[in-house]
Amino acid sequence: DIMMPEMDGIGLCRRVKEDVRTSHIPVILLTAKDSIRDKEEGYDSGADSYLTKPFSATLLNSRVRNLLDMRRKLARMIVGKAKDEERGMPAGEVRLSKLDEEFIRRFTDVVTEHISQDKLDIPFMADKMNMSVSTLYRKLKGLTGLSGNEFIRKIKLKRSLYLMTEQGLNVTEAAYSSGFNDVGHFRRCFKEEYGVSPSKYTKR
């Protein structure tokens, strides 16, 4: 609700959306303020949806379902599994906030920079990202639908793909260079992710 004691809904929404720890959380503003200027202020604060009172529970449920569906599509786009029709949707329909884009970019850069690190796990990443382990876990789960370690593995596999297809490394070289210490494990992970073995993929 926009009109609340101590901090109004606009201020709360802005605080949520400007904090990288919570910026991925969808926000619906519910209010009796229905002027164009009020709505502009609401969306400028980062709100994902704006409903004016009186409103129906059916409409609210519909908005919630739509927002959750958009979040699922965003998650698929982040991890590279979006359907063609999702990729082609207008930017305003499926998009990350600048703060969340920067978070994903930074997380990916840190993984790539430390890809040969023996303990490249969530505690290590939390320290590098200046977040608590629980906050980082929730953030990644909210954005990607994956656990932190699952997302790290996807980044490593994508790196291995680049090394094989663009840099000409063989399977063993790509496995070790992308942070896998066991080539057999790498092959299994690769096939699970891409549907074929790494050697078959590179022969396409």
Q: What role is predicted for each listed range?
A:
Residues 4, 42:
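Receiver (REC) domain active-site loop signature in two-component systems and cognate sites
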Residues 5, 14, 23, 35, ...:
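The feature encodes the CheY-like receiver
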Residues 55-64, 68, 76:
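C-terminal output helix
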Residues 60, 136, 140, 185-186, ...:
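Short hydrophobic/aromatic patch on the recognition helix
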Residues 142-181, 203-204:
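Terminal helix-turn-helix DNA-binding modules in bacterial transcription factors
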